[in-house]
Design a protein with these regions (language model features):
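Long, well-ordered hydrophobic secondary-structure segments characteristic of membrane-embedded
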Residues: 53-91, 98
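Domain-level detector of nuclease and nuclease-like folds
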Residues: 81-90, 94-246
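Hydrophobic alpha-helical membrane context
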Residues: 14-15, 105
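N-terminal module-boundary/linker segments of secreted carbohydrate-active enzymes
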Residues: 17-71
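Sec-dependent N-terminal signal peptides
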Residues: 4-13
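Short, flexible beta-strand-to-coil junctions
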Residues: 14, 68-73, 184-187
Length: 249
């Protein structure tokens, strides 16, 4: 009964916000989002990475791995790629390149690009996201740590991987979910359906459990400045996933 009450209160909270596409649901809302939140152009892939490393994720010259918080220091705002790459970071596509983000706008859309430690990017590969049973985790990844056994401390700071699944650290699970729902909605013509549907339910739970932060809002609007002033609508209006019926309620 308590869980049901919490769920009802959460849904009530969603609908007290300013809504995108007021009164629209399911396919009508999908069509509205495609018409109003699809960027007509993105930066080139090189330029997008420069903006990502030099501005969006650059905090006083520090750029950190999205999944592990491993940090490269002294990153310039101009031409940052050489420093970032030499420090061991590259660009992670939350929606994998091999499953729909291999070229054009889907590849360069910064709403699903993140700085990532090279080996962690490889561990993630093109695997779906999900919850991994701790005893089945192959790699525990945090900062520069790569452990094969369950950590004794700071366990929620670690991302986890197996050869078929990837679980990001707790603090970014909602960010991941909102990026994946964005990509699948906006780029449905190229997005792999199986990849999305096998993880959509857990992603919705992550969306609920890890709400939008001020930092996430600020970043999506910074990105929008380079992409036709279009933010990720799933960050702006957190009721969208529910209203789109993209998950099983």
């Amino acid at each position: 009964m308590k869980n049901k009450l919490i769920y009802i209160l959460f849904i009530s909270f969603l609908f007290t916000q300013d809504e995108i596409g007021v009164g629209l649901n399911t396919q009508d809302l999908i069509n509205y989002l495609k018409s109003n939140y699809t960027t007509s152009s993105t930066l080139s892939y090189n330029s997008a990475r420069d903006v990502m490393y030099g501005e969006i994720y650059n905090v006083n010259g520090q750029v950190s791995c999205f999944y592990t918080n491993f940090t490269v220091q002294n990153v310039p705002t101009s031409n940052p790629r050489p420093v970032v790459h030499a420090g061991g970071l590259n660009c992670e596509h939350l929606w994998p390149q091999s499953l729909g983000a291999s070229s054009g706008n889907p590849k360069s859309d910064m709403h699903h690009l993140k700085p990532c430690k090279e080996n962690v990017n490889s561990y993630r590969s093109n695997n779906p996201y999900g919850e991994i049973v701790d005893s089945q985790t192959d790699n525990w990844l945090w900062l520069n740590y790569n452990l094969s056994n369950i950590p004794n401390n700071n366990i929620e700071e670690f991302s986890e991987s197996t050869n078929y699944l990837f679980e990001p650290r707790e603090d970014v699970k909602g960010d991941v979910a909102r990026s994946i729902f964005y990509f699948y909605t906006i780029y449905s013509n190229v997005a792999d359906d199986i990849f999305f549907h096998q993880q959509k339910d857990i992603l919705y739970q992550w969306h609920l459990n890890d709400p939008v932060t001020t930092s996430e809002i600020n970043k999506t609007w910074l990105i929008a400045e380079y992409q036709n002033n279009i933010p990720n609508p799933f960050i702006v209006d957190t009721s969208l996933i529910y209203r789109l019926s993209l998950i099983h309620i």
